[in-house]
Amino acid sequence: MSTKSMIRDVELAEEVLSNKAGGPQGSRSCWCLSLFSFLLVAGATTLFCLLHFGVIGPQREEQSPAGPSFNRPLVQTLRSSSQASNNKPVAHVVANISAPGQLRWGDSYANALMANGVELKDNQLVVPTDGLYLIYSQVLFRGHGCPSTPLFLTHTISRIAVSYQTKVNILSAIKSPCHRETLEGAEAKPWYEPIYQGGVFQLEKGDRLSAEINLPEYLDYAESGQVYFGIIAL
């Protein structure tokens, strides 16, 4: 029933009761009826406004956990992806500490992982299936003192797609740990410079991915898990 109909019914009832009212108590009855009518109309109007603007009423159904969600943290997205399927391609390789002076990836070390079709060939990860992938990598540089010439450290993740066979940089970063030269005779203080990169990309079966740096002689192998490279199918 609409608010207008409720008001019209109240006015009609008031008119009928006013005609029937008589005697010395007629005016008092009309006054009480008017007060009741006012309260009824006010309540009906308030109820209509609350329903119209959605303040009260049936609650909206919450979005199904299986539906799309674009503001979930990356960790939650990965956890949901892993729970939905355990046969998605994944790889996590670490730096080969037995190859000084160069960055070589290895999959036979502790905490390394190669599963569901991903291969490590020619120091590159080979994508086994089409789809969205999280690509990530971290390197850690270490040195003592700063040379007279500028020192720039680069970390680049590249893709060679099967469709055009051209090496393209998809993630790249550059840092300079030295802002001034270490004076002759001054103490050469140690410095550390980590670089982490990650992103989601649409890849094709057979794509090759590489993670490279420009100055491998500055790599820090002191602790395991400091230099790594990996992909996760989403």
UniProtKB/Swiss-Prot annotation:
Residues 89-234 form the THD domain. It is found in: Cell membrane. It is a single-pass type II membrane protein. GO terms for molecular function: cytokine activity; tumor necrosis factor receptor binding. Residues 57-234 are extracellular. A lipid is attached at residue 20 (N6-myristoyl lysine). The record marks 34-35, 39-40, 49-52, 77-78 as: Cleavage. Residues 1-35 are cytoplasmic. Glycans are attached at residues 81, 96. One of its GO terms (cellular component) is extracellular space. Signal peptide: none annotated. It holds the Pfam family TNF. Disulfide bonds join 146-178. The modification Phosphoserine is found at residue 2. Its main location: membrane. The soluble form derives from the membrane form by proteolytic processing. The membrane-bound form is further proteolytically processed by SPPL2A or SPPL2B through regulated intramembrane proteolysis producing TNF intracellular domains (ICD1 and ICD2) released in the cytosol and TNF C-domain 1 and C-domain 2 secreted into the extracellular space. Keywords: Cell membrane, Cytokine, Disulfide bond, Glycoprotein, Lipoprotein, Membrane, Myristate, Phosphoprotein, Secreted, Signal-anchor, Transmembrane, Transmembrane helix. Gene3D superfamilies: 2.60.120.40. GO terms for biological process: extrinsic apoptotic signaling pathway via death domain receptors; immune response; necroptotic signaling pathway; positive regulation of canonical NF-kappaB signal transduction; positive regulation of extrinsic apoptotic signaling pathway; positive regulation of NF-kappaB transcription factor activity; positive regulation of transcription by RNA polymerase II; regulation of biological quality. It comes from the Eukaryota. InterPro entries: TNF (IPR006053), TNF_alpha (IPR002959), TNF_CS (IPR021184), TNF_dom (IPR006052), Tumour_necrosis_fac-like_dom (IPR008983). Homotrimer. Interacts with SPPL2B. Belongs to the tumor necrosis factor family. Cytokine that binds to TNFRSF1A/TNFR1 and TNFRSF1B/TNFBR. It is mainly secreted by macrophages and can induce cell death of certain tumor cell lines. It is potent pyrogen causing fever by direct action or by stimulation of interleukin-1 secretion and is implicated in the induction of cachexia, Under certain conditions it can stimulate cell proliferation and induce cell differentiation. Induces insulin resistance in adipocytes via inhibition of insulin-induced IRS1 tyrosine phosphorylation and insulin-induced glucose uptake. This is Tumor necrosis factor. It comes from Ovis aries.
